């Protein structure tokens, strides 16, 4: 059975932005089978500055968890608006979470 993840995305804090760095974190919890994370900025795929770590399967329910971190310079972060994290499992629809900088 496929279990879709709960996906959350966290924008960088103003305190961090003030240091010149922006870290955006995407967390996906309790999903099966294993999946992949992709990031988009203003609708375009992004492949650099990403670090993803997965936890091993949970022995109780065989699900996975992951967290993916996108790190940018503050200037670059401020020059874009929409940040999107997608978690895809096989052929199903990916679970998508995004935020718009204008709304934060």
Curated annotation (Swiss-Prot):
SUPFAM superfamilies: Immunoglobulin (SSF48726). The keyword Transit peptide does not apply. InterPro entries: Ig-like_dom, Ig-like_dom_sf, Ig-like_fold, Ig_C1-set, Immune_Resp_Modulators. Pfam families: C1-set. Keywords: Disulfide bond, Immunoglobulin domain. Disulfide bonds join 26-85. Residues 5-100 form the Ig-like domain. It comes from the Eukaryota. The cDNA from which this sequence was derived contains a terminator codon within the V-region coding region. The origin of this codon and of the differences between this and other sequenced b5 C regions are unclear. The cDNA clone was made using mRNA from trypanosome-infected b5-homozygous rabbits. This is Ig kappa chain b5 variant C region. It comes from Oryctolagus cuniculus.
